[in-house]
């Protein structure tokens, strides 16, 4: 039996009232006969597919209506200063959803769509389950929508048992009724006049659909609240683009935290104790494995025989098990994927194709994609299951993709974002036995351009990291970086990438840039070591071993006779350095000296809760890291000295260090004009005296020695040739303590980057202490033993430099390293069970638990702000400053004011400091902001270590030629060597990621902001000397 339920539309006499009336005489069709009582079939039309041609009235889905959330005060949401596309959670729109729905109801197409939903409910809930035994009619049917958009329902649906036996009638809400043969049962549906409520609906492509529901409805006498005829799909076709049917992280906090709520019921005290301790041990194990892995790899490169190229991937293949162990600690189950990835190369011993890599690790890859902060990916990840459905091996995966090749390739080519990748995609779809790193190497040109564009965008969005990002930008400025994944010799490629000047195209011009190492050093040092400027130029910035010039490279390529082969020298020095690090510094023997011991492990963790919070009542964890005389051997320092030039030009060095400084020139000019103190009458001998002093110093230079030898004298107190590489240079002994503590610490949810049912938790604002006051740093070379100093004579300058070095080392060690560091941080835990399933998992089918970690938090207004250009305009710079730099400058200004009295900068309260960063305006008093202020951490640290030493020469005899004879006056000479090492850092840690809109075209999500400034200052030496007799 089939039903033709007749719903016709009519407009009642009362103006503004629309009604739908279902006639009392409707078409009934049973197995044996058909009776038609009304000739209204002409108005019927089949508008749905697959329902056995069930005919419906002119109740139609509305044409698709999309509301795009845009920037601008006249739009639904004001994106403040960010014009690009951002993503919202539905809670950001608040009552705007209802407002847009109410406006939509005034549209002529709205009411037919409402009735279409009603008709589907009649079919699916009343007719379809009962059509085999019951006829269905509607003695009364009224659905009205008044001019003020209030809806009412008044329906009687009559079921008639047309069989010869008793039948079970199935009704909505799980109700069943027994109906005798030939008997009827009336089912009542009523709703008093009421405003229809909006019901958000999840749609693909990050779109929020709007459905509707009644606040309350009566189904056969039973009141049902929040009732929708079509809860999972609607014929309204009204939707918001770029809006997710979920909640942002701040709204989720309200839903998930508090007495009886998810986090409070699922995080137990014993979990916190176990997780915090596991977190410390895990981080320690990870650090040791990374160090040991690096040591093994560098040892392989260092022991490479000349003339036998050793590629990066061949060495990675040898240490793949270490990578597996490392990444399993980072995240259980990830290790196998990384190990397989390393083997996806034709250079690997056991090669793994791209398709086998994907097939064997599909679940891990899918989870990684989910965790990337790329909202566009999220809507298509569901297709992965379809792709793998029925596939049993990697060959099957290849054949499945082959069947889609004619669809995939054109789609890739026509998409602006993926068109450049089409050659790579085509090769991947054509060749079954291909490998990841072979593809990277072969298509390095494509990947270079993509990566350059990515880094350029990233640099725009991270102005406070401009220097660091610039290094990576320049590294991938040419295709050569991808040769690391080819068969090229790794050591040669490192020399080429990091120690060689680069030729780059800037518009129409070809420019030469410093090597990446020199670029980094210049960025780090800046103008803060002006006193050493000329020396840095000679030995670092213009050193061919660290900054091999294009001209030298060309001469080497032509094998020019007599030219120094700096490329070979670089490779030789790198291998020596790598070998020593691998065999000594990062050897397993040396690393095993460092151990972690538990002191306190939070034996009695207690959790407290209120209606809106979950707190750790008290946290008290302490671990001790014992260093066990960790050694840095002389060989490491000697290997580093190999990068200094071996030219014999110490006279030039002495000139630049002592006799070309402004202080020396000023003193010399003064004495020439005034004479020596107490000997003003003898002005005429002053120029000769200075000339003799300079000659005396220069005559003390051993002409066979280089700057390497002078550094050997200074650092080892011995001749380089006499220094044993296996002896200790520095030993690190004693221990340092790591402490986590605090009281009444908030516990909040923690999320991956994309929508994910798996979540973690974080303990906010943990007092973190690293107490290094018990660390013993011992410089082993404490006594000068050199028998053949680079600068000796009566000035004994090599020995003086050694004394300056030991004094500076002791000062910096005590003032910087042997200190107690205190700051706040969050402990974040993504706990897993033994079977690797998440211990905390939400039901993301529930929109209130579907958390959108990347949602723009409109309404909070807490995005980072761009500073007005007029405020920050400086010479040659009209760009707005990053907010974290503004914060840094404000606090640094206070630091400068305190510097004279050696006081630490005052720690401003969080609210004041956030005022530098966030667009909170007049909203500080709102309760919504209180949790943000309370749960944001700002750490500011300033450290300065000064050293004060001097070079002294007692009773230095200076020969001075007079007219008829020579005299030998004696002078005491003193050259102060003073300077300081300064470290300043500012970090801001938000409880959740928020959009940084400080750079208009490059908004991004940030959770942690860091600014670090380091400077080494060496004061211009101001020599002083005085006459002490003959």
Swiss-Prot record:
- Which InterPro entries does the annotation name? MG075-like, P116
Q: What is its main location?
A: membrane
Quote the subcellular location field of this record. Membrane
Q: Which UniProt keywords apply?
A: Membrane, Transmembrane, Transmembrane helix
Report membrane topology: Single-pass membrane protein
The record's GO CC annotations read: membrane
Q: What is this protein called?
A: Uncharacterized protein MG075 homolog
What sections of the protein cross the membrane?
A: 7-29
The record lists the lineage as: Bacteria, Bacillati, Mycoplasmatota, Mycoplasmoidales, Mycoplasmoidaceae
Pfam families hit by this protein: P116
